[in-house]
Regions:
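Membrane-interface soluble catalytic domains
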Residues: 1-54, 126-127, 131, 135-136, ...
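Active-site-proximal alpha/beta segments of enzymes that process anionic O-linked groups
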Residues: 16-206, 211-220, 313, 333
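Short amphipathic alpha-helical face segments that pack within enzyme cores
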Residues: 77, 236-239, 315-319
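Catalytic-core regions built around general acid/base machinery
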Residues: 81, 129-132, 236, 240-250
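Active-site rim elements
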Residues: 115-120, 178-181, 225-234, 245-246, ...
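Polyampholytic, low-complexity intrinsically disordered segments
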Residues: 214, 232, 242, 357-360
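Histidine-centered active-site microenvironments of extracellular/periplasmic hydrolases
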Residues: 253-254, 260-298
Length: 380
């Protein structure tokens, strides 16, 4: 079943053709209007929760290097685990091609989409998903298959996104050697550690950020000099996720699992950008398989709900807010029909940015701006 999302400021549409000078000017004006509009948007969340509301955990699983296009290019787009989710966003834009800004965008997703520069500006706590959930009684948790030290990754989440939890540390089995020679933990072991420790936790409600970089380009098997190809690593991760979901279902624990990749791996590239390069965040890289699964609720419909239209992190934060507002876990089959839960989620026009490149869609065509220069049609 497909359910349309809500509204976003309309982007002009015409048949593709040679870009006109007036279009180039209009693209810049449209981008400025987009940023101004997004700055005022907010996700709606409850002011508080009743003692009668059914507690549940929220698990945000952030996966590096996995786009919709990567799944197709690797013949993994029909992997069985993808159909097990209750909700799938068909055109979710991660809005960047790099890990650091992707996590900042996810964790600041209770507001509209900021520019790349604004993302690193002054903190706005009203935009921080973990902070907003903290006011509702949610305790933070943090797990990774890496240390978070590379490129000051973890510290930026603390400084710019309201992450206060310490990393859960355990002696996990070694799975890969990272591109930077860091030891990377086995992802299934990390998932099982979360489940095991959650079962013994005294916290009534937790929100966990879990970040995996197993699919990052350059990772290799221990003792091997060459990088492990993308497809076997991706299949292994999807298989592990399938196993984890089986075990979580058997536990009966009430959990909202949100899978939201950071960006793609650029498995096959395009005419402009070679495979595995992500300097220009085009739609092949930034449209990622974002999915939601509810555990611990009996009699949910088997049919997967597809959210159509262009969406991004504001829709995800809004969905979490609607789940809380509806006390969705409080009734068998969910307190409201699943299609009502995703109805009218806010849409966001596809605009993506890195520090040196911006990409957007205008008149059914992708445009790119490099290093603050002139907007040009993207010929990929």
């Amino acid at each position: 079943m497909t359910v349309a999302g809500g509204t976003a400021p309309a982007a002009p549409t015409t048949k593709p053709g040679k870009a006109k000078a007036e279009d180039i000017k209009a693209v810049g004006e449209w981008y400025t209007a987009f940023v101004d509009y997004e700055r005022e948007r907010r996700a709606t969340m409850p002011q508080g929760l009743s003692e009668k509301d059914t507690p549940f955990d929220i698990l945000l699983l952030s996966i590096c290097s996995l786009s919709n296009d990567d799944l197709v290019a690797s013949q993994l787009d029909t992997h069985p685990v993808l159909n097990r989710f209750n909700i799938r966003f068909d055109e979710f834009n991660s809005a960047t091609g790099y890990s650091g800004p992707a996590l900042l965008r996810l964790l600041n997703g209770a507001c509209g989409q900021p520019s790349h520069n604004d993302l690193y500006g002054e903190r706005r706590t009203e935009c921080e998903l973990m902070t907003r959930l903290g006011t509702l009684g949610y305790t933070q948790r943090l797990l990774m298959d890496h240390s978070g030290e590379y490129d000051n990754f973890l510290q930026s989440l603390r400084d710019k996104a309201g992450v206060t939890a310490s990393i859960d540390k355990a002696k996990f089995p070694l799975r890969y050697m990272g591109f930077d020679d860091e030891e990377l933990a086995d992802d299934l072991a990390v998932l099982r550690h979360w489940q095991r420790t959650s079962m013994h936790s005294k916290d009534r409600r937790t929100v966990t950020l879990m970040n995996f970089i197993a699919l990052h380009d350059g990772n290799r098997l221990p003792g091997h000099g060459r990088s492990e190809p993308f497809k076997p690593r991706a299949k292994r991760l999807l298989d592990d996720l399938d196993t984890f979901m089986n075990e979580l279902e058997r536990s009966g624990r009430k959990v909202m699992l949100v899978v939201v990749p950071e960006h793609g791996a650029a498995v096959r590239g395009d005419k402009i950008q070679a495979p595995r390069l992500r300097d220009i965040p085009n739609l092949r890289i930034t449209q990622v398989p974002t999915m939601v699964k509810f555990f611990g609720i009996k009699n949910l419909p088997d049919e997967q709900i597809h959210v159509s239209g262009h969406t991004s992190y504001l829709a995800l934060s809004s969905l979490i807010g609607k789940t809380l507002e509806a006390d969705y876990f409080g009734k068998d089959g969910g307190s409201v029909p699943l299609e009502d839960l995703v109805k009218d989620l806010p849409q966001t026009n596809p605009v993506s940015e890195n520090g040196q490149a911006q990409v957007l869609k205008y008149k059914d065509r992708e445009y790119v701006r490099l290093n603050g220069g002139e907007w040009k049609p993207y010929g990929g």
